[in-house]
């Protein structure tokens, strides 16, 4: 009976050692997973910063060009407004006189399709 008790004790100790080894392995695995996750996060952050820097650099070059385009468009708009304004003042009297002549010099005529019925 003592040998059975001793055998049971050995089995319990072996089971405890196996359980301890499993727990230790789980801890190491979790530690490696956390470390891998932290490294991946650091790599992702570094990549994101690099891409954002590239984007800002490209955006600055494009926006600089767009800023120049906006200035050119504004200048062209001012020139066209001045051109239209001078054209308006140049032809205003003549056009106004033509409109008044058409309004005052009415020549009443019957339409060609009009049929007079008595």
From Swiss-Prot:
It comes from the Eukaryota. Residues 14-26 have a biased composition (Basic and acidic residues). Keywords: Coiled coil, Hydrogen ion transport, Ion transport, Transport. Residues 3-53 form a coiled coil. One of its GO terms (molecular function) is proton-transporting ATPase activity, rotational mechanism. Belongs to the V-ATPase G subunit family. V-ATPase is a heteromultimeric enzyme made up of two complexes: the ATP-hydrolytic V1 complex and the proton translocation V0 complex. The V1 complex consists of three catalytic AB heterodimers that form a heterohexamer, three peripheral stalks each consisting of EG heterodimers, one central rotor including subunits D and F, and the regulatory subunits C and H. The proton translocation complex V0 consists of the proton transport subunit a, a ring of proteolipid subunits c9c'', rotary subunit d, subunits e and f, and two accessory subunits. This is V-type proton ATPase subunit G 3.
């Amino acid at each position: 009976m003592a040998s059975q008790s001793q055998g049971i004790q050995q089995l319990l100790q072996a089971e405890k050692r196996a359980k301890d080894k499993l727990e230790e392995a789980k801890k190491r695995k979790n530690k490696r997973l956390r470390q891998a996750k932290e490294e991946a996060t650091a790599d992702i952050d570094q990549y994101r910063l690099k891409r954002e820097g590239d984007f800002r650099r490209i955006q600055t070059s494009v926006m600089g060009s767009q800023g120049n385009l906006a200035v050119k468009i504004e200048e062209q708009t001012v020139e066209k407004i001045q051109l239209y304004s001078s054209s308006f003042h140049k032809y205003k009297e003549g056009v106004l006189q033509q409109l008044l002549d058409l309004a005052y010099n009415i020549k009443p005529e019957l339409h060609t399709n009009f049929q007079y019925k008595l």
